[in-house]
Amino acid sequence: MSRYLGPRFKIIRRLKTLPGLTSKRPKYKKRVRRSSRPWWKKSRHLACLQEKQKIRFHFGLTERQLRQYVQITKKVQGSTGQVLLQLLEMRLDNILYRLGLAGTIPGARQLVNHRHILVNDHVVNIPSYQCKPQDVITIKGKKTDQLKTIITRNRNKARENKIPYHLTLDLSQNKGIVNKIIDRKDIQLNIKEMLVIEYYSRRI
């Protein structure tokens, strides 16, 4: 399954807030609830599917990519759900988004694909690149002025969202630093990751 490129509001109306997908918020219309099916409850499978879709669309993954990440978690010690989120949080495109260098993860992915980003002074054009503690992320020199304007705009839009403690942003030097791997308690996503693991448990 390819990466979703359709209307983003359609997704967040169904799955609720996904800040990595879009910074905009749709206007919800009030609907009168019908009581024709008061017995209806969300099935376990549907709950797992929705959590899986939240992760997919928030981080901008294809179905194949997410499946591969779940497979990796089974080879690593620790809680599989926590490891899954940590792997996704340490992707280069997500780090750029969390630093405020891009307004959304798709926007961060575009910066990486266009070779604007350096990791430890080397150009990296792979959005899924796994960042490590002590990695230094900078913006390529010849585009600095243009991108600083974009960065400032994105930071102003997200003033209420503080940069996570595992990252440091130095706008004076136009760089970000990965201090450490993020802890689960500091991942502020409304996602039940163990339901995602459960979803794939019978499919891998």
UniProtKB/Swiss-Prot annotation:
Protein name as catalogued: Small ribosomal subunit protein uS4c
| GO cellular component assignments | chloroplast; small ribosomal subunit
Which organism's genome codes for this protein? Gnetum parvifolium
Q: Where is the S4 RNA-binding domain?
A: 90-150
Biological processes annotated in GO: ribosomal small subunit biogenesis; translation
Function per UniProt: One of the primary rRNA binding proteins, it binds directly to 16S rRNA where it nucleates assembly of the body of the 30S subunit.
Name the Gene Ontology molecular function terms of this record. Answer: rRNA binding; structural constituent of ribosome
Q: Does the keyword rRNA-binding apply?
A: yes
